[in-house]
Amino acid sequence: MAGHSKWATTKHKKAVIDARRGKLFAKLIKNIEVAARTGGGDPDGNPTLYDAIQKAKKNSVPLDNIERARKRGAGEEAGGADWETIMYEGYAPGGVALLVECLTDNRNRAASEVRVAVTRNGGSMADAGSVSYLFNRKGLVVVPKEGTTEDDVTLAVLDAGAEDVNDVGEAFEVICEPSDLVAVRTALQEAGIEYESAELSFIPSVEVPLDEEGARKVMRLVDALEDSDDVQNVYTNADIPDEIMAKIS
């Protein structure tokens, strides 16, 4: 189980994380609130909530903020918005497929902000279903390389349902079916292997290779989308080589 996945914008996000820490905190808090509302406020009985809390902790969200979000979602504390998940589809420059996942309390505002960000940066919106078929819904666990090897990770997750382990530079990505995400994450924990995040994602079935100019255009559009408070995640099928990503980050 090897290979090299460049579809994610994870490394790019890390490069701009300091400038956007406030926005990142807000999005992580929103994830906790929605997970608690959907599956209950007990992380032990709600794997999605557990993973949302762990991700927030690893991104240094204050524990008090995390607990308040959990309580709001579970109905133990007043407040909290009526969040709605909406997926928008489109194309970035160069024919790169684009999935934009929003979590919003105002559908009209979200649609407007996504449309403006896409069209002002050389992209175009697409009808529902015309882009999403290029992606598969998968579980994704990111494991930092420090202190572990690809063989260590592979051995730990092989019997837990993992489909692939990819070396993506500073980390390994473990890909699995959504139903196997908890088993894969648990297998890593039992093997004593630290992981950075465990969540559902969209993995492209076909990638579009980009040169530096094309990569800059696509990442400019992604940045514009991620500036919106309503946008939770942006998925593309761009294939950007490491050396180009390092230049433009």
Swiss-Prot record:
<dbReference type="GO" id="GO:0005829">
    <property type="term" value="C:cytosol"/>
</dbReference>
<dbReference type="InterPro" id="IPR026564">
    <property type="entry name" value="Transcrip_reg_TACO1-like_dom3"/>
</dbReference>
<dbReference type="InterPro" id="IPR049083">
    <property type="entry name" value="TACO1_YebC_N"/>
</dbReference>
<dbReference type="GO" id="GO:0003677">
    <property type="term" value="F:DNA binding"/>
</dbReference>
<keyword id="KW-0804">Transcription</keyword>
<keyword id="KW-0238">DNA-binding</keyword>
<dbReference type="InterPro" id="IPR029072">
    <property type="entry name" value="YebC-like"/>
</dbReference>
<keyword id="KW-0805">Transcription regulation</keyword>
<dbReference type="Pfam" id="PF01709">
    <property type="entry name" value="Transcrip_reg"/>
</dbReference>
<dbReference type="InterPro" id="IPR048300">
    <property type="entry name" value="TACO1_YebC-like_2nd/3rd_dom"/>
</dbReference>
<dbReference type="InterPro" id="IPR017856">
    <property type="entry name" value="Integrase-like_N"/>
</dbReference>
<protein>
    <recommendedName>
        <fullName>Probable transcriptional regulatory protein Tfu_2096</fullName>
    </recommendedName>
</protein>
<dbReference type="InterPro" id="IPR002876">
    <property type="entry name" value="Transcrip_reg_TACO1-like"/>
</dbReference>
<keyword id="KW-0963">Cytoplasm</keyword>
<dbReference type="GO" id="GO:0006355">
    <property type="term" value="P:regulation of DNA-templated transcription"/>
</dbReference>
<dbReference type="Pfam" id="PF20772">
    <property type="entry name" value="TACO1_YebC_N"/>
</dbReference>
<comment type="similarity">
    <text>Belongs to the TACO1 family.</text>
</comment>
